[in-house]
Structure formats: structure tokens, C-alpha cells
């Protein structure tokens, strides 16, 4: 044998799903092969130069909690960090980082190249090696055959990808890369349900041609947030601002006048696009009452002149793209350096997958990322990690693992995909999780790091840091419980000004911190209750666990209760539009199916667990919580 050709796990594709899958498998001790058509594009950001956001940041933290790569890479490549929803409760706060594409890609590649048990090889895959209903390897474009006990497909938008710019279209996996036509054809020969989806990207603009003096400036947060539980702000490169402009009546008129030249509106594109990241032509038509749409001008890196105009994804012809850009303030003389485009690609119905992301039809074959109908780097990376660890477990002869809905956003993601499927690119939101108070960014490690350790994903450094943090949290909570103060105590005159009402009875530190007007920093600034913890992560946990203790306990009770509501009856001939909080889509499905019980309602495609929770609350208020015999 002149070259290694037998592995435990093969990963096909080196994007965000593929890199996490490869790292997970290799960390668990499996000999892993990562096949990519171009080593230089490992971890490439094909669309927006950013990581995180509402729901997405939660996934990144969960990946990190289990030893994954994405959070550590963005800490090294992020050029602007912000906490979204900072003024709201901890459940919906989310970290977002603007990325330097080059630095991020370098961080990913560096981690991969230094990972034991992982071999990277540059070759496109054209076929799978099958033995009956089991996959046993892959064949590359020059006929090399590699065998493995498990294969993970993380091929993104490359399967029979077709790029559209106006009425022109050509084959491509993304701009500048070839599609994967042979592999797409081979997969279509297997017993999968296949369909087409669409996504898009905006034109890129030369920063030298923008009049920034006419734009609003958006800076990052101070102090600087970090993504990884092991990270620090010292790892971040130089931080720079983003800028804001707006579409206007002129922009919208240009779009309306050229809809006949849009491949989407002309019926040339058959794939369904992302509902929550629509093209600018879609936004103008769907929200005709809006006078303007906010556009964020995001730098693509510290050494790049390219600007990503977040909010004007389009497949309109290039001349129309120029008119759209020039219609906006500050961009009147802007130069486009890369045209925007839409891309259509194959995706495979995720209802054909187990919750481990292994195919129900082909043993040993796993799917992760956009091939499953999702959109976004974070959704892809989370699936990649799960598929990679389960491919490794299969190779080791062990049972698969997947998180529950009350355990992780990753659990929500795979349950939604594998149970309900999707007809449009699926994006994660906090609203998709019915137990979001438990599934916060800040406690992702407390939820998942111990599991990651048991699975073999978490190294000694992370584990020791995690155990020390847990110990600090419990020790500090006990310390606050043990410190009592009463109205006549020494130092109460320092405490009372911090309270809405002066102390009238004895209270300990935890009880004081539970008050809405008190926070951990102010409490521990008092000599009696100080000093504060130096570890900011542990200090944050102490405050959240104490302040939200009652709410968290109630949500844990709700989880147990939800399991008991399978046979709870719904009123006959019920009009679900009378239930406040249900989406129009859910109301339509419930009124159409007329379920007799909560159990039946929960199995209707599109009726989310969050909607079931709303129904249970409504039944309780109406005094209708009856169970069938």
C-alpha cells in the first residue's frame, strides 16, 4: 500500500459542517479523513462575514462547550464583537462577531492541521462505495478509493449547484468554485427524497468608493465580549466599526421596474429561498408599506477593501445591482467588485435521518449542514459536530447520541429537522425553543461540557477549567447564603440606599441579590458581602442562577409536565384563532386538522412545541385541562 486508504471516518466537504465533523471524529480518537476540493478554502465564509446572532450565537456556545472549533476561531478572527439584546433577559442575549475572513479561515485551518488522528486530502468526491444498504467509502475524481466505517456528507450548496445573475446562469458550488454534479447524480440514484433550495448573497463593494462621512457608524461593545468559554479579549485582533445606510423610494422603484429580469420572479429559479434572509427584491415586494430597509455595511477584513452590504442579497442583473447600490446614501459613486447572485442546490429531506444525523436508509452515512435544508454557518457547524461524533461512535461500535430539546438548541435543531422536515432554508431562532430560559448562551458549558467529556470530545484543559468554574459558583452561592444582615446590623446604612425599600427583616446575600434592584457587582462592592469573584463567567452564573431560580424551577416542572400531556383533550370544534400567541401558520394547520388532543396536535407538521406550550396555558386558563380515559 503506497498511501493510506482505510480510515474509521471519512468527511466529504471542508466547510463549517465538515471542519467541525472532522475535529469531533478525530478528537474522539478515530482515524479521520477530510476530503475537500480545495484545502485553501477550509472554513471559508461563503456569504456574510460574521458568526453568531440571535439563536445562532447559542449554537456556537454549545459547539464550544463540547470542545468544538467555531468559537475559538472567531475569537482569533473577530474584528467587531457585540452582545445583541443586551438590555433583555439572559435567555435571549446573543453574541455576534464580525469576522476577518482571512483570519477566521487561518484559525480553522491551523486547528485542523494540528489535530491528531486527522488527515486532510484535496480531491473532489464523485461516488460512494456501497455494500448493499451500507456505505463503506468514497471515490475521488481521479479514481482514488478510500474506505471507512462511516461517511459524513457536508457538501453545502455544491450538489448540482446553479448560480443565477439575472437571466444568466451557470453551474457552480459558489462563486469561483465548481459544483459537485457526479456526486449529486449518484445520491439521486439512492432511495432519498431530494428537492431544491435557493440562497443568495449581495454584491461586494470597494470601500475606497464609499463616502463614509454620510453614513451612521456602529462600534462594537466595550468591554469586548468573547465567544469561547476558554477565550479572552486579548486574542481578538484590532477592532473596527461597521456602517449603516438605508434603501429608499428610488431603490424600491428600480427593483419594481426590473422584476421581469429577476430569475426568481420570472420562474427560472425553482428552489425556495430563506424566509428570514430574503433577497432585497423579495423584501421590497413583501413589505410594500416600508419606505426604507436598513443596510449594514460590514468590512470583510483588516486587510481587505471589500465591504459586505448586509441586506441587499440579490439575483438581479448586474446593471440593476449597480443602480440599487448607487441609489443609497453614501454609495452614490460606489464600485461593485463582485456581483451578487442566487444559487440553487440539492437538499435531502432530513426526515430520512435519525436524530444522530445518520441516514435511516443507508447505514453508516451521515448528513450535516445545508444538505439537510438549513441555512447559516452556525447551524451547519452544530450539525457537523453532531454527525462527526456519531460517525465516530458508530465506527467504535457504540450507540449514537443526540441532545434533547430541553438540553440544547442543537437538540431543537435536529428534532425540528428530523421530525418536521423543512420546505425552506431552516434558520435557528430563540423562539423555536420552548425551554429557552434553560438554554442560555451563558450556561452552555453547564449543560453540555460534562456530556462532551463523557463522549471523549472535551480535553483536559477545558475540563479542568470547567470543574474549577463549577466549584467557584457553588462556593460563592454558599458564601452568600451564609452572610446575614438585619435592620440593626453594622453596615446596613450602606445597604439601604441600594434598595428600593429599606431592610425590615433579616436577609442573607442570596435573598438580597434576588431583589430586582440589586445586582452581584453592587452587592459585593459592599464590605460585608465582598470580595466579588474574579472570574466574570462564574460571577455571571451566580447572579443568573439566584435571580431566576424560581423561573428556572417552573420551567423544569413544565418539562416534566409536558411529557404527561399526551392525552390532554382539546375542545370539539375549537377555533384556534381565539388562542393568543399562535402564529397564523400554526392556526391554519390546527383548524385544518382539528386535533382531539394535545398529543395529536403535537404530531401535526409545523405545529411547534412552543405552540403546544401556548395551548396548554390556554387550556389551564379556560379550566379545560381534562385527560382522555
UniProtKB/Swiss-Prot annotation:
The protein's name: tRNA uridine 5-carboxymethylaminomethyl modification enzyme MnmG
Alphabetical list of NCBIfam families matching this protein: mnmG_gidA
Functional summary from the UniProt entry: NAD-binding protein involved in the addition of a carboxymethylaminomethyl (cmnm) group at the wobble position (U34) of certain tRNAs, forming tRNA-cmnm(5)s(2)U34.
Record: residues binding NAD(+): 273-287
Binding site for FAD: 13-18, 125, 180, 370
Molecular-function annotations in GO: flavin adenine dinucleotide binding
Pfam families tied to this protein: GIDA (PF01134), GIDA_C_1st (PF21680), SAM_GIDA_C (PF13932)
Originating organism: Sodalis glossinidius (strain morsitans)
Intracellular or extracellular location(s): Cytoplasm
Family: Belongs to the MnmG family.
Subunit and interaction comment: Homodimer. Heterotetramer of two MnmE and two MnmG subunits.
Amino acid at each position: 500500500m503506497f498511501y493510506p486508504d482505510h480510515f474509521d471516518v471519512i468527511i466529504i466537504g471542508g466547510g463549517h459542517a465538515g471542519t467541525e465533523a472532522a475535529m469531533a471524529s478525530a478528537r474522539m480518537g478515530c482515524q479521520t479523513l477530510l476530503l475537500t476540493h480545495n484545502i485553501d478554502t477550509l472554513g471559508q465564509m461563503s456569504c456574510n462575514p460574521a458568526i453568531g446572532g440571535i439563536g445562532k450565537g447559542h449554537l456556537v456556545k454549545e459547539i464550544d462547550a463540547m470542545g468544538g472549533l467555531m468559537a475559538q476561531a472567531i475569537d482569533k478572527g473577530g474584528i467587531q464583537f457585540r452582545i445583541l439584546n443586551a438590555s433583555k433577559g439572559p435567555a435571549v442575549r446573543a453574541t455576534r462577531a464580525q469576522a476577518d475572513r482571512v483570519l477566521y479561515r487561518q484559525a480553522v485551518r491551523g486547528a485542523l492541521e494540528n489535530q491528531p488522528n486527522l488527515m486532510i486530502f484535496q480531491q473532489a468526491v464523485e461516488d460512494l462505495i456501497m455494500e448493499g444498504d451500507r456505505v463503506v467509502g468514497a471515490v475521488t475524481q481521479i479514481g482514488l478509493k478510500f474506505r471507512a466505517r462511516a461517511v459524513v456528507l457536508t457538501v453545502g450548496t455544491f450538489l448540482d449547484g446553479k448560480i443565477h445573475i439575472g437571466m444568466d446562469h451557470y453551474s457552480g458550488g459558489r462563486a469561483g468554485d465548481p459544483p459537485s454534479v457526479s456526486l449529486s447524480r449518484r445520491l439521486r440514484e439512492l432511495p432519498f427524497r431530494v428537492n431544491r433550495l435557493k440562497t443568495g448573497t449581495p454584491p461586494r463593494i470597494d470601500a475606497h468608493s464609499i463616502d463614509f462621512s454620510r453614513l451612521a457608524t456602529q462600534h462594537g461593545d466595550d468591554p469586548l465580549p468573547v465567544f469561547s468559554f476558554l477565550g479572552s479579549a486579548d486574542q481578538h485582533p484590532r477592532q473596527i466599526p461597521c456602517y449603516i445606510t438605508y434603501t429608499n423610494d428610488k431603490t424600491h422603484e428600480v427593483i419594481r421596474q426590473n422584476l421581469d429580469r429577476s430569475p426568481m420572479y420570472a420562474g427560472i429559479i425553482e428552489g425556495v429561498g430563506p424566509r428570514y434572509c430574503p433577497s432585497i427584491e423579495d423584501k421590497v415586494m413583501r413589505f410594500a408599506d416600508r419606505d426604507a430597509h436598513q443596510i449594514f455595511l460590514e468590512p470583510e477584513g483588516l486587510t481587505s477593501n471589500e465591504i459586505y452590504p448586509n441586506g441587499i442579497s440579490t439575483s438581479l442583473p448586474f446593471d440593476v445591482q449597480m443602480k440599487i447600490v448607487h441609489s443609497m446614501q453614501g454609495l452614490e459613486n460606489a464600485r461593485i467588485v463582485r456581483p451578487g447572485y442566487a444559487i440553487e442546490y440539492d437538499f435531502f429531506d432530513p426526515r430520512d435521518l435519525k436524530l444522530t444525523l445518520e441516514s435511516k436508509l443507508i447505514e453508516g452515512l451521515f448528513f450535516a449542514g445545508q444538505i439537510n435544508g438549513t441555512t447559516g454557518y452556525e447551524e451547519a457547524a452544530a450539525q457537523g459536530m453532531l454527525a462527526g461524533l456519531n460517525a465516530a461512535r458508530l465506527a467504535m461500535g457504540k450507540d449514537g447520541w443526540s441532545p434533547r430539546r430541553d438540553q440544547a438548541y442543537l437538540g431543537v435543531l435536529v428534532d425540528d429537522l428530523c421530525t418536521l422536515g423543512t420546505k425552506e432554508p431552516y434558520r435557528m431562532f430563540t423562539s423555536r425553543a420552548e425551554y429557552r430560559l434553560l438554554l442560555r448562551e451563558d450556561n452552555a458549558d453547564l449543560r453540555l461540557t460534562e456530556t462532551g467529556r463523557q463522549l471523549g470530545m472535551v480535553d483536559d484543559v477545558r475540563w479542568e477549567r470547567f470543574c474549577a468554574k463549577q466549584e467557584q459558583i457553588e462556593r460563592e452561592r454558599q458564601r452568600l447564603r451564609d452572610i446575614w444582615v438585619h435592620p440593626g446590623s453594622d453596615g446596613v446604612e450602606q445597604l439601604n440606599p441600594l434598595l428600593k425599600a429599606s431592610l425590615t427583616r433579616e436577609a442573607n446575600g442570596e435573598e438580597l441579590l434576588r431583589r430586582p434592584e440589586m445586582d452581584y457587582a453592587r452587592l459585593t462592592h459592599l464590605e460585608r458581602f465582598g470580595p466579588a469573584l474574579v472570574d466574570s463567567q462564574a460571577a455571571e452564573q451566580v447572579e443568573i442562577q439566584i435571580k431566576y431560580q424560581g423561573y428556572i424551577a417552573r420551567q423544569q416542572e413544565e418539562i416534566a409536565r409536558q411529557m404527561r400531556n399526551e392525552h390532554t383533550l382539546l375542545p370539539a370544534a375549537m377555533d384556534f384563532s381565539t388562542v393568543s400567541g399562535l402564529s397564523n401558520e400554526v392556526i391554519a394547520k390546527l383548524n385544518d386538522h382539528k386535533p382531539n388532543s394535545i398529543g395529536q396536535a403535537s404530531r401535526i407538521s409545523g405545529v411547534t412545541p412552543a405552540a403546544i406550550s401556548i395551548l396548554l396555558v390556554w387550556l389551564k386558563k379556560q379550566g379545560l385541562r381534562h385527560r382522555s380515559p
